[in-house]
Design a protein with these regions (language model features):
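Small-residue-enriched core segments of transmembrane alpha-helices in multipass membrane transport
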Residues: 65-70, 133, 161-169, 192-193
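Structural signal for the N-terminal portions of transmembrane helices
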Residues: 91-92, 157, 161, 181-193
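Small-residue-rich segments of transmembrane alpha-helices in multi-pass membrane proteins
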Residues: 97-107, 162-174
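Alpha-helical transmembrane segments and their membrane-interface boundaries
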Residues: 2-141, 150-152
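Alpha-helical membrane segments and immediately flanking helix-loop junctions
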Residues: 139-143, 157-167
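Transmembrane helix-loop junctions at the membrane interface of multipass transporters and ion channels
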Residues: 83, 113, 117-121, 170-191
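Hydrophobic alpha-helical membrane segments of integral membrane proteins
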Residues: 59-66, 154-160, 173-174, 186-187
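Alpha-helical transmembrane bundle and helix-membrane interface signal
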Residues: 23, 148-156, 176-183
Length: 193
């Protein structure tokens, strides 16, 4: 029994390849920046997601999820909570609110000028969240925590970005505003939150 316990502890040891606190902090800081590359990628991800939703293209929407920098600010909020840094949590939360507002505003403009106004199945899928969406967010967040704290870069963070699908609900909320549909707007924001 002791041998089995030792083997299990060895197999599930998360400290073996853990990055230093400085490395973790630096990664999270760089992912939470709201300027330069991160802002350019945010804009591009929003347009890619909006076009994918408009054209009903799952592959394009997944591409937008992969490049979206929204995960960085959310990780920063979690890091601030974990380190009891309320000022950092507040600063990161304000950054997230800015990103949310910016994405909704720009996607609203996109959908307002888009010649395609019919709701695709991809748009509809983001208006009725279920308990499964909550579980995906919970387990995705846990995987993200483990992934960002490793010494070596892994494919965990892109996988979490796809699983949690942050950008498409914001763009769907923009669609709801552009088409004056409270159902799309409220359902998509509920899914995002």
């Amino acid at each position: 029994m002791d041998y089995l316990k030792k083997v299990l502890l060895d197999v599930f040891d998360l400290n073996a390849d853990r990055a230093s606190m400085e490395e973790i902090s630096e990664r999270i800081e760089s992912g939470a920046l709201l300027k330069g590359t991160n802002m350019a990628i945010l804009i591009l991800a929003m347009f890619i997601a909006s076009i994918g939703l408009n054209m009903n293209s799952t592959a394009v929407i997944i591409g937008a999820m992969l490049i979206s920098p929204l995960m960085g600010v959310i990780m920063a909020i979690g890091y601030g909570i974990a380190t009891y840094d309320t000022a950092y949590v507040r600063k990161s939360f304000l950054k997230l609110l800015f990103q949310i507002g910016f994405c909704i505003l720009t996607s609203t403009i996109y959908f307002y000028i888009s010649p395609i106004s019919t709701a695709s199945s991809e748009l509809l899928a983001r208006t009725e969240p279920t308990i499964w969406d909550v579980l995906i967010a919970l387990f995705g967040g846990l995987a993200g925590i483990i992934g960002i704290t490793r010494k070596e870069k892994s494919n965990v963070i892109p996988g979490v970005a796809i699983a949690t699908a942050l950008m498409p609900p914001l763009c769907t909320a923009g669609y709801g505003i552009a088409t004056h549909s409270l159902k799309f707007f409220s359902g998509a924001l509920y899914l995002f939150c």
